[in-house]
Amino acid sequence: MTAFFLLWLALPGFLCAQQACSRGACYPPVGDLLIGRTQLLRASSTCGLTKPETYCTQYGQWQMKCCKCDSRLPRNYNSHRVENVASSSGPMRWWQSQNDVSPVSLQLDLDKRMQLQDIMMDFKGLTPAGMLIERSSDFGKTWRVYQYLATDCASTFPQVHQGQPKNWQDVRCRPLSQRPNGHLTGGKVQLNLMDLASAIPASQSKKIQELGDITNLRVNFTKLAPVPQRGSYPPSAYFAVSQLRLQGSCFCHGHADRCAPNPGGSTTAVQVNNVCVCQHNTAGPNCDRCAPFYNNRPWRPAEGQDTHECQRCDCNGHSETCHFDPAVFAASQGTNGGVCDNCRDHTEGKNCERCQLHYFRNRRPSAPIHETCIPCECDPDGAVQGAPCDRLTGQCVCKEYVQGERCDLCKPGFTGLTFANPKGCHACDCSILGARKDMPCEEETGRCLCLPNVVGPKCDQCAPSHWKLASGLGCEPCACDPRNSLSSQCNQFTGQCPCREGFGGLTCSSAAIRQCPDQTYGHVATGCRACDCDFRGTEGPGCDKASGRCLCRPGFTGPRCDQCQRGHCDRYPVCVACHSCFQAYDTDLQEQARRLHSLRNATEGLWTGTGLEDHGLASRLLDAKSKIEQIRQILEGTSVTEQDVAQVANGILSIRRTLQGLPLDLPLEEEMESFSGDLGNLDRSFSRLLLMYRSKKEQFEKLSSEDPSGAFRMLTMAYEQSSRAAQQVSDSSSLLSQLRDSRREAEGLERQAGGGGTGGAQLMALRLEMASLPDLTPTINKLCGRSRQTACTPGDCPGELCPQDNGTACGSHCRGALPRAKGAFHMAGRVAEQLRNFNTQLQQTRQMIRAAEEAASRVQADAQRLETQVSTSRLLMEEDVQRTRLLIQQVRGFLTDPDTDAATIQQVSEAVLALWLPTDSATVLRKMKEIQAIAARLPNVDSVLSQTKQDIARARRLQAEAEQARSRAHAVEGQVDDVVGNLRQGTVALQEAQDTMQGTGRSLRLIQERVGEVQQVLVPAERLVKGMKEQMSGFWARMKELRRQAQEEQAQAMQARQLAEGASQQAMNAQEGFKRLKQKYTELKDRLGQSPVLGEQGNRILSIKMEAEELFGETMEMMDKMKDMESELLRGSQAIMLRSADLSGLEKRVEQIRSYINGRVLYYATCK
């Protein structure tokens, strides 16, 4: 109740303090820092510490008074140690230095940072002539002077100015004032820090922060006051301070209004505690840091009305710790700088605001906070392996032909989602003509979805009596004339119905004109001849009925329709349309060829006129011939490289410049005016070609970079080199610019032309020579990889540079740069696909090995757990067996005790027989046989684990071999056959690893099944043992009760036996007395036989006789009962022996069960 009352009294002050701190900076109340801390104060000089010292002071006007200073013991009345300056020491205690020692210092070394407000010093003797006060805020590492004090500042500290300081580094000297009554002793010095900084424009909080923070304080007495001499002996000169008061509090940076004792600190009673009770969410002994989880802004001392309160970090409930990051604070423009630590619930980020990799935001509104981020639910078959899902939406990164948020659906037109497919799904094997465009096949089954009237597994056939599959809209009915046609089924491609004799037309609806049958031509009257056509490339009747000209199907060409038309790739008879980019390139190239041919025809007239005289013409012609010869030598080499092609291009360029630079008459001026527009069009056409080429090249490089195969990169580089070589040969954009320059040069020459010259004949001869020499056909054949039919010279090279009209390829022995590049590109694609499949198989093998290791670990853990269970069960059963054995011995001893009565024996026997054992002997034996059978079937765990380790080691070895094969495949440079061989070896190794892992998995599953069977048997056994234990506990209590009853009955039996023995003895004595009495009665009867009257004595004798007979009868009856009891005890003893024999048999069975269980426990304990 008292504590509650004190708390009630302190509560208003605490609430007021909180309110004060909530309005701005707050500071604790001040007190004397020296009280309780005098042990931290020291002086550089103290009188009488080693021996007593005498000092003399003036007494009156002309007398001297001398005293002793003995500071060896602190409690001496004349001890003047430094701790006497504390206000708690009393008025008659002071500190005094040694005589004539200067300078002297008093220094206070605090153990914590404190806030100083006021210094007050009372002197005992003369006031020093000069002194200074300084402080340290870093425990004595650096010192700063508060103020210099002197009676004469100019002479004592000439380098220090007087007045008020103007800034924090400005230190001034203040004169010491004299006492008004003229006394020389008992002066005072007071230094108030707020008054000291009164001239500095700063807030009170700033002044306290700059001046009040101290860890050490030092007062240096630098000059003794002059001592007046008025007698024969001068007074002693010394420094003495009677009282030093340091008003201050704990230093809290404006974040606390009270101080608390230091936990675990000194027990000395102090007036000012040194631990701040922090407010504003700050912490630390001096509130010099933000409290845990309040680091959203940097810590700052409180100033005036601004508390600079530390703000709580925003971790969205996923963390309780954070730290301040200046970089984050600057990036947020001073808004928040807290960075959360140890984010939980699978979150991360400076505010735990986003989910970790492979987790995404739970979109369920009522989800608990620990389920904010849930694992990605990507389908491993359709998602890119290892790629994380989107952290906000959960959208997985799908393979190329897979879609859906979980990547569990094939895109339209694809089916068969599998993990092994690097693209996820494969294209539907459906006809592009007969299947639906929006969904060619079903995503799950791959069954093709046909257009109307289209049938077949691949939707590649028209339904009966339908045709025109190529329309792409489904098949149409044949509409055969039912009277004039042989059947309703028409040709699926042409729609031609089978007509009766004399009828024709598509539907047999009109009378037929007699003509030669299909695949023949001519007239029926003059005879029909067979068409000379390859009918695999013809359509309809095969050839024209009149001329015999073959009618080629679209995509086929040639006189016999046995060649692929330009724009169709592959080999005859399979002619499919080339890629759309070919059509764009081909159109532009044909336009270019047409314009170049027009230019060539337009410039032919320029060679007929006479040229200007040019003395350097001969040298230029020779130079052209040498370059042509050099080009011919380069082209005759065994291989064509990029440098060779560049030299050929330079040679051709030089020849053209030579030809175009010759001085000729230019008669066709009107044609020259149109050349500028033609060249501009050609320039724009080549610019478009160049952009298309670069775009395709970038796409190809991007696709190539996704495949890490070294062989693929090598082949790609080879293809790029060949492509650049072909591009340099076929690129004419630079030639057009050169033609433009040549045209300008020709115009200059035209302006210089003033008449005839002597070079016309030479030009004509050169023109004739250039028309036939050099022959560029071999060079073109090397570049194009095929035989050119028409000759190509610098003067005349008709047609395309690499004609493809016949559509034939150069075959496997092609040596052309362009076909080689194409072949290399296709080969690279196949190798890249094989490498991707190989990587997928390696990943699957890794997963299988990891699963096997985890399964082995689980089996080992199960075995250890089983061992622990068996060991525990063994200990429990041993304890139960020991208790059972002791109980049996006690029961046996109890039953064989001769003093135990039959009723007690019967109760014990019935209690023993009422015990419920696990089952009868047959059932126990059957359970033991089941356990033995299961144990016999259970494989040796050590051997299985050893085999498992061997299998895992073998799998790892095979995996290493596969990795080496893959590395060798990556290191191949051009050896494609070796790459394929290594891939086959890797596939074989992977198959062996998979077989090994499957065998290991079977072994592990067998172990797990056996462990389960053992557990199924052990669990009932444990329950039986526990049941026996409970019954034995109850039986034990019952035995104790029966033993107590038996002991009581035994005591009663002993008492009854004693009574029976006494009664028997009395009966024997009575019988003997009766015999004697009977004998005397006979004698008396004989003596008194005459008298029939017995008298009084006779009556007495008769009564005695009757009593004796009654007593004898009772005695005989008691003897009979004792005999019956003896026989009954004999029968009980025999029953006890029988029951004891039964218990011995049961004890043997229990021993057998325990021995067997101990054996199995030992076996399983060593199987780990």
From Swiss-Prot:
Disulfide bonds join 250-259, 252-276, 278-287, 290-310, 313-322, 315-340, 343-352, 355-373, 376-389, 378-396, 398-407, 410-425, 428-441, 430-448, 450-459, 462-475, 478-490, 480-497, 499-508, 516-528, 531-543, 533-550, 552-561, 564-575. Residues 723-760 are annotated as: Disordered. Residues 576-781 are annotated as: Domain II. Residues 727-739 have a biased composition (Low complexity). Residues 22-249 form the Laminin N-terminal domain. Residues 813-1168 are annotated as: Domain I. Glycans are attached at residues 220, 601, 806. Residues 782-812 are annotated as: Domain alpha. The keyword Transmembrane does not apply. Residues 732-754, 827-879, 944-1129 form a coiled coil. Found in the basement membranes (major component). It comes from the Eukaryota. Residues 740-750 have a biased composition (Basic and acidic residues). CDD domains: EGF_Lam (cd00055). The keyword Secreted applies. The alpha-helical domains I and II are thought to interact with other laminin chains to form a coiled coil structure. Domain VI is globular. Binding to cells via a high affinity receptor, laminin is thought to mediate the attachment, migration and organization of cells into tissues during embryonic development by interacting with other extracellular matrix components. This is Laminin subunit beta-3. The lineage of its organism: Eukaryota, Metazoa, Chordata, Craniata, Vertebrata. The gene is Lamb3.
